[in-house]
Amino acid sequence: MSGEATAAVAAKRSVRAYAVEGDKTMDIFDVQSVDENILRVRTPLLFEIGEELSVRIVDDSSTRDTFVRVRAHVGPSDMRVTELEILS
């Protein structure tokens, strides 16, 4: 599936992702696309490659808490997309 098609699927499904720290959720991710186990997000924060984060993924039909690992930062610096690998 092309990046544009995947982004369209994410938009249609209204997928959102939030960083979770303790009992707080932080709206710091703009989900660009979702594949089977990869979230591609834009964020104002720069996470380290390999860093693991607790996140809440919400779509039209479900909510789940999981962990992700920062896999890569791709694209030009002004349009940087962070790839998050879903671990569980």
Residue ranges: model-predicted function:
Residues 1-88:
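Structured alpha-helical
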